[in-house]
Swiss-Prot record:
This is Probable UDP-N-acetylglucosamine--peptide N-acetylglucosaminyltransferase SEC. InterPro entries: OGT, OGT/SEC/SPY_C, TPR-like_helical_dom_sf, TPR_rpt. It comes from Arabidopsis thaliana (Mouse-ear cress). Keywords: Developmental protein, Glycosyltransferase, Repeat, TPR repeat, Transferase. One of its GO terms (biological process) is vegetative to reproductive phase transition of meristem. It comes from the Eukaryota. Pathway: Protein modification; protein glycosylation.
Length: 977
């Protein structure tokens, strides 16, 4: 907002009338402005003093004192025409021109008087005032000093010299001048008021108050002192006292534009914009060229959203004062808000051309660069802003956002700390810092920040929603649900809260209004996609939702595009890639250089499944680089991969652009994304395209939607070509099953029949037929649970074994099952176990029941390795077909894969009631574990390498990525040369 002189008015008696003029009036005319209007005064004069120059000059003086400057000038000029050598009249004419803001004419008439009377001290004083108003304070000071030299006891000149020194920041000299003026004239209210201004400028508010009060005591009608008192109250936040005193100032001096400007500011601060505009318009009536008044009117229109009016008034302000910095800055803001961004940039640059270190203009220009994804220039502007000001929090906040987007979480948190140092009650900064803490796993600190934000701003829906997310991440699901609902109470149209509440409810089997909520969420997603807004449903959640696969593809595309935007913020030039020459050909590499990027090299299902893969690659043909996005968790899985991979780089502390540079410097030919859209992913690295071929594999069972990912490694069952339209990548079909595991190397103990645990060890009934599902509860839905309940009711003495995954879902699941007629003892929940124990105890189940909407992938592999048959129903999306592929790769898929829920139910009941049939299937499954392709990790690695060479050879031949199938007897690959 533009601010006028809303503190102390820099007062100086702008014009001084000489003693000679006073002597003229010693013959006292019966003319009094206080008792007559200007018109009656003129009538009275015309009757009695028509040809009397002294009387006419006295009349002009009276009109001047009454504020009728134009009439005063007319009569003074009549005297001037008859007698141009009257210096007292020249002094008065100069004074009138000053009041009319015609400063050049003021100076000219005073110079004319000085040519006649060179020792006329008052003329020098008045010229000094005019030069000061023209902005030449140094010349003004010279003229004040001449006036004082000519007349050392000229108290008014000492007072006005003080105001000039104050304008130059020479506070000590200004104070001495005020004190000298008051020693000459203790009743000089101007000097008392100026001394108050000096005290205020030095932070001595009580002393300033005393000075202003003394001025009012001496002269209760002294409007400027009332105005300055009002300024003190305004700055202390006592707006009602400020309002009272500014009103008194304009009542005492109706022609007081600065007081009207400040009165308008008080009304504006009190939320009374109509009265504020009226005050600014009063100021304009007295000072039509007041840029400040136009600017302040514009600021009100801006805050009211009347941007066209705001722009018009800002332009009027600039037409009056082309060097009005705040008007350029604020006009830029208004233009930006209506989409005229290029014009806004020109305004900010114009402001900076006039004042290169203008903090608001630098920050606002930085905001635009930030929106344009020009993060380098934006950062530079924010840092430059902070170099010239210490009181602005916005540049710290924006730098924090940039640092966070670039993965520089430490600096982001430091910047948010600075925001909160400047404004400890900044709820937005608390939420943003909480988000940063949450992103790096410091959930407890995130929760504290969100709760503090809510304490400061209880109606802040975002704080409640983010608190809910942190509660969910820390396992406090019920608290999460409560907080999401509170966020939606505060803001019913809150897409992120709506979508996240739905996901949280699915995690705990809360299916009330499920269809209605999914319809609402799907509507939100489609609307966001049409508006080119990042969808509130993440791709990882979309794979488990009953939504159209094409819609899931569109969600992934939007997230991929967002990653491209993040990548562009680093401003890297395009990478140069290794030459497209076949491996082992002249000029080519001796080995294919493969890079794996993951945040899951540690205690994570990905490492449980792929632990041996990185060391199993054939070093004669392939050179493997692993890039770890997460810090060392010191687990056996991390140590194993780190020791067995040919090259292992911990890049967790590096920014994404630095990681991309390293990958490119390592001359990686094929880069594998093992995260996709899972936690810890940094897909912006792939958006920078550091490698010529980029592949999605294993971490995310769905399409990335990314133009910068060329291939998806999958298999014919999981991603048949008939469904290729729901993928953005070209499909690479590995033989058998794409889903690798390491159990043959790491979990041999499961094969020992003597190591089988007892059901009683886990509170499982020895006499019941146990169905089991070890998937997370969010993968379940009423349709499949209804089917399970039907199965339990049809199979005597049966039970369903589930995991507290999470524990908060147990009671809701039990309640739902009971409503379907299932007995309480037929539902058994146990805690989640460590990996090896989980696989060992899985053998205690008789049949595994899979979830169709999102299969058991890792858990599906677990139970098949344990030798327990699994019933699965494949649908269309990738995540719904993985379990079927696992079953097929055992060679026994026909006994476990079904085509409908009806068939699913019948298969489960049939296996439970036909003991010989189940025993035969179980025996076959257990016998196949050491020979079937599903658990042959080395065989799988060779097939994966075949796919890599096919990708590279296609690239070398100049062909675009294309769907292809890997054959185990393909002679194209080095294994078979």
């Amino acid at each position: 907002m533009i601010s006028s002189k809303n503190g102390a008015a820099m007062i100086s008696r702008p014009v001084f009338l000489s003693d000679r003029v006073d002597e003229v009036f010693s013959r006292k005319l019966d003319l009094s402005v206080s008792s007559s209007s200007s018109s009656s005064l003129l009538q009275q004069f015309n009757k009695t003093h028509e040809g009397d120059d002294d009387a006419r000059l006295a009349l002009a003086h009276q009109l001047y004192k009454g504020g009728d400057f134009k009439q005063a000038l007319e009569h003074s000029n009549m005297v001037y025409q008859r007698n141009p050598l009257r210096t007292d009249n020249l002094l008065l004419i100069g004074a009138i021109y000053y009041q009319l803001q015609e400063y050049d004419m003021c100076i000219a008439r005073n110079e004319e008087a000085l040519r006649i009377q060179p020792q006329f001290a008052e003329c020098y004083g008045n010229m000094a005032n005019a030069w000061k108003e023209k902005g030449d304070t140094d010349r003004a000071i010279r003229y004040y000093l001449i006036a004082i030299e000519l007349r050392p006891n000229f108290a008014d000149a000492w007072s006005n010299l003080a105001s000039a020194y104050m304008r130059k920041g020479r506070l000590s000299e200004a104070t001495q001048c005020c004190q000298q003026a008051l020693s000459l004239n203790p009743l000089l209210v101007d000097a008392h008021s100026n001394l108050g201004n000096l005290m205020k400028a030095q932070g001595l508010i009580h002393e300033a108050y005393s000075c202003y009060l003394e001025a009012v005591r001496i002269q209760p009608t002294f409007a400027i002192a009332w105005s300055n008192l009002a300024g003190l109250f305004m700055e202390s936040g006592d707006l009602n006292r400020a309002l009272q005193y500014y009103k008194e100032a304009v009542k005492l001096k109706p022609a007081f534009p600065d007081a009207y400007l400040n009165l308008g500011n008080v009304y504006k601060a009190l939320g009374r914009p109509t009265e504020a505009i009226m005050c600014y318009q009063h100021a304009l009536q007295m000072r039509p060229n007041s840029a400040m008044a136009f600017g302040n009117i514009a600021s009100i229109y801006y805050e009211q959203g009347q941007l066209d009016l705001a722009i018009r008034h800002y332009k009027q302000a600039l037409s009056r004062d082309p060097r009005f910095l705040e008007a350029y800055n604020n006009l830029g803001n208004a233009l930006k808000d209506i989409g005229r961004v290029d014009e806004a940039v020109r305004c900010y640059n114009q402001c900076l051309a006039l004042q290169p270190n203008h903090p608001q203009a630098m920050a606002n220009l930085g905001n635009i660069y930030m929106e344009w994804n020009m993060m380098g220039p934006a950062s530079s502007l924010f840092k430059a802003t902070l170099a010239v000001t210490t009181g602005l929090s916005a540049p710290f906040n924006n730098l924090a956002i940039i640092y966070k987007q670039q993965g520089n979480y430490s600096d982001a948190i430091s910047c948010y700390n600075e925001v909160l140092r400047i404004d400890p009650l900044a709820a937005d900064a608390l939420v943003n810092r909480g988000n940063t803490y949450k992103e790096i796993g410091r959930v407890t600190e995130a929760i504290q920040d969100y709760m503090h934000a809510i304490n400061f701003r209880p109606t802040m829906a975002e704080a409640h929603a983010n608190l809910a997310s942190a509660y969910k991440d820390s396992g406090h699901v019920e608290a999460a649900i409560t907080s999401y609902k509170q966020a939606l109470l505060l803001r019913p149209d809150f897409p992120e809260a709506t979508c996240n509440l739905l996901h949280t409810l699915q995690c705990v089997c809360c299916w009330e209004d499920r269809s209605k909520m999914f319809a609402e969420v799907e509507s939100i997603i489609r609307r966001q996609i049409n508006m080119s807004v990042l969808p509130s449903v993440q791709p990882f959640h979309a794979i488990a939702y009953p939504i159209d696969p094409i819609l899931a593809l569109e969600i992934s595309r939007k997230y991929a595009a967002h990653c491209s935007i993040i990548a562009s913020r680093f401003g890297l030039p395009p990478f140069t890639h290794p030459a497209g020459l076949p491996v082992k050909r002249e000029g080519g590499f001796k080995r294919l250089r493969i890079g794996y990027v993951s945040s899951d090299f540690g205690n994570h299902p990905l490492s449980h499944l792929m632990g041996s893969v990185f060391g199993m690659h054939n070093r004669e043909n392939v050179e493997v680089f692993c890039y770890a996005l997460s810090a060392n968790d010191n687990t056996e899985w991390r140590q194993r991969i780190q020791s067995e991979a040919e090259h292992f780089l911990d890049v967790s502390a590096m920014s994404s652009d630095a990681i991309a540079k390293i990958i490119n410097q390592d001359k990686i030919q094929i880069l594998i994304n093992l995260n996709g859209y899972t936690k810890g992913a940094r897909n912006e690295i792939f958006a920078m395209q550091p490698a010529p071929i980029q592949v999605s594999y294993m971490g995310f069972p769905g399409t990335t939607g990314a133009t910068y990912i060329d291939y998806l490694v999958t298999d014919e069952f999981v991603s048949p070509l008939q469904y290729a339209h729901i993928y953005s990548e070209k499909l690479v079909h590995l033989p058998h099953c794409y889903f690798v595991n390491d159990y043959k190397q790491k979990n041999q103990d499961v094969l020992d029949p003597n190591s089988k645990p007892k059901r009683s060890d886990y509170g499982l009934p020895e006499d019941k037929f146990i169905f089991a599902c070890f998937n997370q509860l969010y993968k379940m839905d009423p349709e499949i649970v209804n089917t399970w309940c039907n199965i339990l009711k049809r199979v005597p003495n049966s039970a369903l074994w589930l995991l507290r995954f999470p524990a908060a879902g147990e009671m809701r699941f039990r309640t739902y099952a009971a409503a379907q007629g299932v007995q309480p003892d037929q539902i058994i929940f146990t805690d989640v176990a460590m990996k090896s124990e989980h696989i060992r105890r899985s053998v205690l189940a008789d049949v595994i029941l899979d979830t169709p909407l999102c299969n058991g992938h890792t858990t599906g592999t677990d139970v098949l390795w344990a030798g327990v048959p699994m019933i699965t129903l494949p649908l269309e999306k990738m995540a719904t077909r993985v379990a079927g592929s696992l079953c097929l790769a055992t060679g026994l898929g026909h006994g476990m894969i079904v085509n409908s829920l009806e068939e699913y139910e019948e298969k489960a009941v049939s296996l439970a009631l036909n003991k010989p049939k189940l025993q035969a299937l179980t025996k076959e499954l257990r016998a196949s574990r050491l020979t079937c392709p599903l658990f042959d990790t080395m065989r799988w690695v060779k097939n994966l390498e075949r796919s890599y060479f096919k990708m590279w050879n296609l690239h070398c031949s100049g062909q675009q990525p294309q769907h292809f199938k890997v054959l185990e007897n393909d002679l194209e690959f080095p294994h078979d040369r």
